[in-house]
């Protein structure tokens, strides 16, 4: 005969039993995804991170773990958007996964080119301010600061903040990525415009910065002493400049940043492999690869994966990021201010 105590005990065990069954079902469902991905044999990723060394390492790690080949196509964000539009209209979709900046990804999401990725075991891993939604998972973060020539600028004279660039000593001495075109310069303009105001940029324009679009060439120009400062500087790139008389500066206000996102294209020909790659993005292996190259992971606890000289970069204060809805307006405003 069941006593009241026995009934209460059974009632307490019921939720645990249901939870265990649910977890087992999820495990079985995910095993079907993994098995399906292996049958598909490959996944095609379209990436806007042209020439970065991380993607080939991720491809190698993915195939080693799952036996699924990752085929990589790299191109500029605008070129990828047009390619995807053409594929979607024609009904001949070749790409599976998008790997692109959050601004481009947001614009594409509004165009309806992605499909929900469903449940992923690792979807809850990102830490604030990064999080996944129904279409996108964050993958890694690019942060920007300043690059300074250590032979031309004494430690006491180094700019410590974005506001310090307005000091009279830097008039005509600042090399900058073009703020009037898509890229790091536009990110810097939008974020600092939002946080420091239009007046800040009007004053910075009077400093007569020399702007161009020769990103890595600009690093060398600063190292050669042609200019003492370059902004905005991709902080992770300092790891490639170890033997040169330059250093990075993390501004006191914080760093503009852009998040790279992963998403699955509508009609992806390898849907299981696409989901598997999306989950793989958020695992320690991939996040550790990004950290090792000085890029900020979107999950916690991986600072130790980075070289000692990059750990400060991974912990840098974040100022803000871009807003896809404001992109055209901000480019127009930058053109008005920086003539």
Language model features with spans:
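A ligand-binding cleft/hinge motif common to bilobed small-molecule-binding domains
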Residues: 103-107, 228-245
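Immediate post-signal peptide segment of exported/extracytoplasmic ligand-binding proteins
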Residues: 25-44, 63-64, 167-169
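Extracellular/periplasmic bilobal clamshell ligand-binding domains
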Residues: 288, 305-339
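Periplasmic-binding protein-like
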Residues: 142, 170-180, 202-205, 211-212, 242-268, 281-303, ...
């Amino acid at each position: 005969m069941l006593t009241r105590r026995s009934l209460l005990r059974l009632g307490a065990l019921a939720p645990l039993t249901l939870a265990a069954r649910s977890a087992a079902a999820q495990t079985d469902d995910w095993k079907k995804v993994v098995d399906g991905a292996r049958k598909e044999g490959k996944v095609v990723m379209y990436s806007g991170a042209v020439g970065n060394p991380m993607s080939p390492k991720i491809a190698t790690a993915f195939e080693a773990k799952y036996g699924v080949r990752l085929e990589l196509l790299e191109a500029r964000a605008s070129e990828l958007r047009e390619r995807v539009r053409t594929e979607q209209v024609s009904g001949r979709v070749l790409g599976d996964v998008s790997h692109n900046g959050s601004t481009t990804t947001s614009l594409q999401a509004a165009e309806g080119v992605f499909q929900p990725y469903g449940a992923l075991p690792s979807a809850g891993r990102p830490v604030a301010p990064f999080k996944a939604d129904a279409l996108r998972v964050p993958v890694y973060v690019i942060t920007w600061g300043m690059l300074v020539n250590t032979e031309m600028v004494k430690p006491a004279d180094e700019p410590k903040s974005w506001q310090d660039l307005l000091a009279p000593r830097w008039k005509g001495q600042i090399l900058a990525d073009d703020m009037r075109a898509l890229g790091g310069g536009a990110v810097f303009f939008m974020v600092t415009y939002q946080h420091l105001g239009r007046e800040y940029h009007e004053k910075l324009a009077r400093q007569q910065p020399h702007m161009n679009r020769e990103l890595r060439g600009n690093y060398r120009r600063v190292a050669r002493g042609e200019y003492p400062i370059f902004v905005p500087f991709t902080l992770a790139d300092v790891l490639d400049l170890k033997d040169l008389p330059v250093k990075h500066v993390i501004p006191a206000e914080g760093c503009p940043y852009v998040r790279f996102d992963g998403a699955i294209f509508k009609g992806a020909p390898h849907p299981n492999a696409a989901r598997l790659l999306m989950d793989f993005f958020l695992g320690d292996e991939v996040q550790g690869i990004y950290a090792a190259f000085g890029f900020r992971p979107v999950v916690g606890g991986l600072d130790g994966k980075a070289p000692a000289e990059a750990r400060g970069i991974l912990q840098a204060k974040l100022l803000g990021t871009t807003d896809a809805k404001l992109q055209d307006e901000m480019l127009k405003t930058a053109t008005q201010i920086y003539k």
